[in-house]
């Protein structure tokens, strides 16, 4: 579905982030590695900057005073942020699209600090080559899969009268489930690695991520998949 494609080939990474996580409040500013590393979200941003296929990065968060520490940190680093409705995440993406006018959007969540840059680049290129509305990966570790969407499809979603509150919150749900959109799922690994949990949702997840970042120091930051699979092979109990 093509609706007013921008006259450029800009790829925008949109990071969803908020300070009000139910299970681990303020996690986006917790240090990686512990105790004196950079905030989780800054580690994530620095990794995204390694991807040559990404032109711009923006953080979209919700409104309210609780987000102030995050906004202040992003401002101090010169990182653009946009605030909007907490539950209507799609509207925040639309605001980012209207500000940056990209052709392609990479959806990133701030609780997933591990990204394989090679897989990310491959997914973006595949999405563009296929002129797809939505592309996602599977078979990567839990918290490493990638989502790419055309900006025009997200703008079209925002105008639909039949979109539900849940679909506005989860942004890409309708792109995958609605046959009107041209979507594709890439099996990014021969073996399903989804049992390897590397997302950060709980204190235990954070402790694991902090240790993994400590182990990753002095190793290539653009090869997270190799690092995670090697670490899992050597220390499987870390991922239990």
Predicted features by range, described:
Residues 11-12, 55, 103, 133:
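Conserved acidic residues
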Residues 63-125:
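Short phosphate-binding loop-to-helix
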Residues 39-56, 77:
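A short, N-terminal amphipathic alpha-helix
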Residues 10-15, 41, 56-59:
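Hydrophobic targeting segments
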Residues 28-33:
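Short glycine-enriched, charge-decorated loop/helix-capping segments at active-site entrances
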Residues 68, 114-196, 204-207, 211, ...:
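Conserved core of the sugar-phosphate nucleotidyltransferase
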Residues 1-25:
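N-terminal nucleotide-binding beta1-loop-alpha1 segment
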């Amino acid at each position: 579905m093509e609706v007013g494609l921008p006259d450029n080939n800009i790829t925008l990474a949109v990071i969803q982030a908020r300070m009000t996580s139910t299970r681990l409040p303020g996690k986006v500013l917790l240090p990686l590695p512990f105790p004196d590393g950079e905030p989780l979200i800054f580690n994530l941003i620095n990794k995204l900057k390694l991807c040559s296929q990404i032109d711009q990065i923006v953080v979209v968060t919700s409104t309210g005073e609780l987000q102030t520490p995050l906004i202040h940190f992003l401002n101090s680093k010169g990182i653009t942020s946009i605030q909007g409705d907490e539950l209507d995440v799609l509207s925040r993406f639309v605001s980012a699209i209207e500000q940056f006018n990209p052709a392609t959007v990479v959806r990133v969540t701030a609780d997933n600090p591990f990204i394989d840059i090679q897989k990310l680049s491959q997914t973006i290129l595949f999405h563009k080559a296929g002129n797809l509305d939505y592309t996602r990966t599977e078979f990567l570790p839990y918290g490493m899969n990638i989502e790419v969407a055309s900006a025009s499809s997200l703008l079209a979603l925002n105008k639909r009268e039949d979109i539900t509150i849940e679909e506005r919150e989860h942004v890409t749900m309708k792109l995958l489930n609605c046959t009107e959109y041209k979507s594709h799922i890439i099996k990014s690994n021969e073996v399903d690695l989804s049992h390897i949990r590397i997302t950060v949702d709980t204190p235990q997840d954070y402790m694991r991520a902090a240790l993994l970042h400590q182990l990753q120091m002095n190793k290539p930051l653009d090869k997270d998949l190799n690092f995670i699979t090697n670490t899992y092979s050597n220390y499987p109990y870390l991922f239990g």
